[in-house]
């Protein structure tokens, strides 16, 4: 009995550590949450029920951008920014656990007609993907943020 208790405790901590390892850090390869006082410009994106408009935007490396996202569709949508590999992983998780609530710094959740902002500093040149990872939305509701070198 005494040998089982340490094993149970170890199993609990191992599970927690594995979950924490899968949790996304505050600073990502795609940048980090930005300071609203340092926004260089605003980009407006509209979600309709099968796409983002525009589907591609350009920013400069190091810029802090205010993304204003409006859900112009008839269904709940999300906008998640990240690498395509991360977006696919999240979309798969949403299919497996559709009712689980999520709250990442690089995720915006919008009801129909709702508008929200995401202030982000794009720290590295390259391509940042965005998508609605909700079940049935991911294949069509995608876009790109091209981060150009300074």
Where are these regions (language model features)?
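Asparagine-centered strand-capping/turn motif at beta-strand->loop junctions
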Residues: 69-71
């Amino acid at each position: 009995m005494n040998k089982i208790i340490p094993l149970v405790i170890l199993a609990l901590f191992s599970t927690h550590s594995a979950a924490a390892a899968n949790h996304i850090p505050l600073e990502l390869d795609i940048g980090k949450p930005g300071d609203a006082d340092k926004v260089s410009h605003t980009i407006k994106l509209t979600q309709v029920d099968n796409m983002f408009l525009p589907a591609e935007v350009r920013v400069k490396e190091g810029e802090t951008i205010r993304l204003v996202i409006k859900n112009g569709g008839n269904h709940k949508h999300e906008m998640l920014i990240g690498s395509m590999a991360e977006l696919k992983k999240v979309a798969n998780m949403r299919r497996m656990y559709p009712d689980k609530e999520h709250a990442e710094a690089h995720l915006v959740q919008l009801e129909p007609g709702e508008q929200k902002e995401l202030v982000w500093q794009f720290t590295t040149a390259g391509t940042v993907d965005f998508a609605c990872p909700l079940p049935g939305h991911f294949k069509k509701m995608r876009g790109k943020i091209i981060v150009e070198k300074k």
